[in-house]
Amino acid sequence: MAYIGRRGLLAGAAGAFAAAAAGPARAAESAGAAGRPGSRRKAAAEFRGMWIASVENVDWPSTAGLDAGEQRDELASLFDAAVAHRLNTVFLQVRPTADAMWPAAREPWSQWLTGRQGVDPGWDPLGTAVADAHARGLELHAWFNPYRVANNHTDPARLASSHPARRNPGWTVPYGGKLYYNPGLPEVRAFVQEAMLDAVSRYAVDGVHWDDYFYPYPVAGQYFDDDDAYARHGAGFATRADWRRSNVDTLVREMSERVRSVRPSARFGISPFAVWRNRDRDPLGSDTRSLATYDDLYADTRTWVREGWIDYVVPQVYWHIGHPTADYAKLVPWWAQTVAGTDVDLYIGEALYRCDPGSATAAWRDPAELSRHLTFARRYAEVRGHAYFSAKQVAADPHGAMARVVADHYPTAVPPR
């Protein structure tokens, strides 16, 4: 079966995962928490989260150009849905395409608010969101995308006149009909951290959250042209792939350190595609046959966990129990083993959006499939919660799958701390 995951939903790239399905891996050596000295506030006894995606107006705002009151009311309604379903955390996407859902010092207002990048929406969405979430007893994790610049074009001249990528087009790489910052440039790495930390320093966010976007997902027939950056900065690496992984590792490690410095109470977490490596390529990999973050996205997610660079990981295990090439029942124990012995909390990302009576897959036509996921995951003490993609499915729950999860697993509310 073709896998159309969150990336396909958000970016409209329906063909990119046609051959992909997944599951990750772990080793038994002791983990290093040295990457994050000190201790953060204790995490929830049971994490219950949902993603609110703003890119392409997936969840919120429902459409660009609503007035400030309508936008705020819609966001409040999603927070209310989280509370009604006994969740305790929301991931709000506040930097979807190198633009901002707050009055940012370094980047323009997001196009997904008004329909035009750089236009003031007349309110402060992130500031309001933090206050409104906390008033409801919810944690608010600010969700950032580090490298994505444009989702539907490759021309820096189409960006807002103040956009740093327009002023520095040499920082960008066009690929697959989209525009990205080049992860191989040290100046890019420094800039994107400053852009994100602008929000972290100014708002009482409970977490800093990244998803599965690092180097772009492979597109057939396309070449990610970082030749010049590799020539200038790739000395000392055996392969370009090793250099690319080092670029992403450095960003994760540095951001981890800086979040701790700027806002010690905030947790830093990442929600990667759920396959680190396949076992046929690495004995530490998962029993899967899929695209893999290590080999295809240059994201060494296992190292981030084992080195303690992140506080939590939310692998997007977006397949059903029994999937032939990426079985939920194989991926969850792999991740449980990966975090074992570390201080990294494991939450499982759940594909609520795939629960659909019209699905071609029988498992997803069954509203009890998601509940079975939680039942299965409870076998593993390392699994400390779940997060659901995405908010509009939590709120509408057209198939009753979320209601079943709540009835079977969330009899009472659990505070976030």
Model-derived segments and their meaning:
Residues N57-D67, Y147-D198, D296:
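Active-site-adjacent "subsite" loops/lids of carbohydrate-active enzymes
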Residues W102-T114, R148-Y175, Y213-A235, D282-R289:
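Aromatic- and acidic-residue-enriched segments that line the glycan-binding/catalytic groove
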Residues D73-A98:
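Catalytic domains of carbohydrate-active enzymes, especially glycoside hydrolases
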Residues A45-G49, L87-R95, P125-T172, H209-D211, ...:
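Glycine-rich, aromatic-flanked loop segments that form ligand/cofactor-binding clefts
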Residues R202, G207, P216-P272, W276-R279, ...:
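Active-site neighborhood of glycoside hydrolase catalytic domains
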Residues Y312-G322, T342, L346-P416:
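Substrate-binding cleft of secreted/luminal carbohydrate-active enzymes
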Residues A2-Y3, R7-A27:
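N-terminal export signals
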